[in-house]
Amino acid sequence: MSSSRPLNGLSRLDAEDRSPYQRLSQRMLDISGDRGVLKDVIREGAGELVTPDASVLVKYSGYLEHMDKPFDSNCFRKTPRLMKLGEDITLWGMELGLLSMRRGELARFLFKPTYAYGTLGCPPLIPPNTTVLFEIELLDFLDSAESDKFCALSAEQQSQFPLQKVLKVAATEREFGNYLFRQNRFYDAKVRYKRALLLLHRRTAPPEEQHLVETAKLLVFLNLSFTYLKLERPTMALRYGEQALIIDRKNAKALFRCGQACLLMTEYQKARDFLVRAQREQPFNHDINNELKKLASYYRDYMDKEREMCHRMFASGDNGSTVGEN
């Protein structure tokens, strides 16, 4: 978000008795057609415009005129919540504004009361009939409607679409999973990854395009392996890690995940085999080398406990047995 004040110093009435918002509005673009929503781009974005049914990831701050501190902001959150247009966003002006934005864009908007809090406002925070200013940064957006509609089709219906469509929808599902994973919502992330995998499994591609499907599957297998580790289900993590290795037997990330899973299952020799192979591919990888150190430490503890248990068993047999005595 912009580190400067929202009005860039426009805090006093000018010679013509125009308010700061009136002065600011003179250089802003009308995107509603009635000057109810005005826009000033601070930083240009890139790519496509936000689609009407998208889920958006944004940072925003809302200001009242003559006030430097926002009355509403989500910038304090480490990871903003994903919001769906038409459902989670209550300001009409913000929705229209977002539809005019591209990924990475930072913009300033003025919303007239009709597009904000109406003639009544929102007491005591928002006075009646108030124009508000919002600074909005579009971090990312996902076209969830396209994905949801496609996933609702039967396998036969999906097969009528070109491969690129399937790959795009699968990628969207995976991106949703990644977002949920970053929110520590591992179960929900797993559901999205499995939806992506189902789409890719259903699709039969011609030989010259099969590598595209395999590449997409590899990413999902790696995501699922990591997610199951987070869910403390190492058997499933190992299964998906091994599926990734079928596609790319030297994939360091897949070898690493398999090693982690085996370590959690106390299968130390298998864990070592996977981790050594991973280290061979990426000898200076900090995570792999640390996992090998952890494995060595766990194995030492395991062997110490085994020796101690054996010692106690034999000691008990020598001192406490009466078998064969008269």
UniProtKB/Swiss-Prot annotation:
Residues 53-142 form the PPIase FKBP-type domain. Pfam families: FKBP_C. TPR repeats lie at residues 170-203, 218-251, 252-285. GO terms for biological process: cell differentiation; meiotic cell cycle; piRNA processing; protein folding; regulatory ncRNA-mediated gene silencing; spermatogenesis; transposable element silencing by piRNA-mediated DNA methylation. InterPro entries: FKBP6/shu (IPR042282), PPIase_dom_sf (IPR046357), PPIase_FKBP_dom (IPR001179), TPR-like_helical_dom_sf (IPR011990), TPR_rpt (IPR019734). Keywords: Cytoplasm, Differentiation, Meiosis, Nucleus, Repeat, RNA-mediated gene silencing, Spermatogenesis, TPR repeat. GO terms for cellular component: cytoplasm; cytosol; synaptonemal complex. It comes from the Eukaryota. The keyword Hydrolase does not apply. GO terms for molecular function: Hsp90 protein binding. It is found in: Cytoplasm, Cytosol; Nucleus. PANTHER family: INACTIVE PEPTIDYL-PROLYL CIS-TRANS ISOMERASE FKBP6 (PTHR46674:SF1). Co-chaperone required during spermatogenesis to repress transposable elements and prevent their mobilization, which is essential for the germline integrity. Acts via the piRNA metabolic process, which mediates the repression of transposable elements during meiosis by forming complexes composed of piRNAs and Piwi proteins and govern the methylation and subsequent repression of transposons. Acts as a co-chaperone via its interaction with HSP90 and is required for the piRNA amplification process, the secondary piRNA biogenesis. Belongs to the FKBP6 family. Interacts with HSP72/HSPA2 and CLTC. Interacts with GAPDH; leading to inhibit GAPDH catalytic activity. Interacts (via TPR repeats) with HSP90. This is Inactive peptidyl-prolyl cis-trans isomerase FKBP6. The gene is FKBP6.
